[in-house]
Regions:
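Membrane-proximal helix-turn-helix segments that form the acceptor-binding/catalytic region
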Residues: 40, 65-84
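Glycosyltransferase donor-sugar binding loop
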Residues: 111, 142, 165-182
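Carbohydrate-associated surface elements
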Residues: 90, 110
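Acceptor-binding helix/loop patch of EC 2.4 sugar-transfer enzymes
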Residues: 47-72, 114-115, 179
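A short helix/loop element that forms part of the nucleotide-sugar donor recognition site in Leloir-type
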Residues: 117-132
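Conserved donor-binding/catalytic core segment of Leloir-type glycosyltransferases
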Residues: 133-149, 155-161, 167
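Active-site proximal beta-strand in glycosyltransferases
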Residues: 21-23, 37-56, 85, 105
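Short N-terminal targeting/anchoring amphipathic segment
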Residues: 13-30, 44-46
């Protein structure tokens, strides 16, 4: 939304209003309904292809059993788009390898760097909240509890460096996480 506002481009987030292009960012039931509705209306569809079978695998209990079906479903969705935008060249290669024959381009998910500038006040609030000692080094990760996000390596390194504070930001219902991750 922010990019469209900055560029002074009209848009709607209401799928029942008139639009020229549908940009779909997820793969739930509402997304597939919007995809088919847009196609029936002769509208162009841009799909944000950040989900892949490879990302889905090893993520939740049972994900490896479902992964082949997820791949078929995602391939179906992406093939019905007019354009697929992925965040990385890697995901572009994966999606293209599925036989998706519409244009697939990689555009990084940019961030607003001004939101992440140094702030001594925020740094102190963070250190107080997490009870970080003065001069103590901190290693952080922001991700769900997935092997592909490196949670096992994060824990191993933390065990080897007891003088460094390791903090993992990310929350997942532990009942969906494989047992070996819960035991870390």
């Amino acid at each position: 939304k922010r990019a469209l506002d900055i560029a002074c481009i009209d848009y709607t987030t209401n799928p029942h209003e008139d639009f020229d292009i549908a940009h779909i960012n997820t793969y739930g039931i509402k997304s597939i309904m919007l995809l088919f509705r847009a196609k029936r209306m002769g509208k162009k569809v841009v799909y944000h292809g950040h989900s892949t079978k490879e990302d889905f695998r090893n993520s939740f209990i049972g994900s490896n059993l479902l992964a082949p079906f997820v791949k078929k479903y995602l391939t179906f969705l992406y093939r019905h788009a007019d354009l697929v935008i992925t965040p990385t060249e890697y995901s572009k290669q994966l999606i293209t390898s599925y036989g998706v024959d519409v244009p697939v381009i990689a555009i990084s998910n940019g961030i607003d760097l001004s939101k992440y500038c140094q702030s001594p006040k925020k740094e102190q609030a963070f250190k107080n909240h997490f009870q970080v000692l003065p001069e103590q080094k901190i290693v952080m990760c922001a991700a769900l509890y997935f092997k592909r996000k490196g949670i096992d390596d994060f824990v191993k390194v933390a065990e080897m460096m007891p003088d460094v504070r390791f903090i993992w930001f990310g929350e997942t219902n532990l009942w969906t996480v494989p047992g070996w991750v819960r035991r870390l």
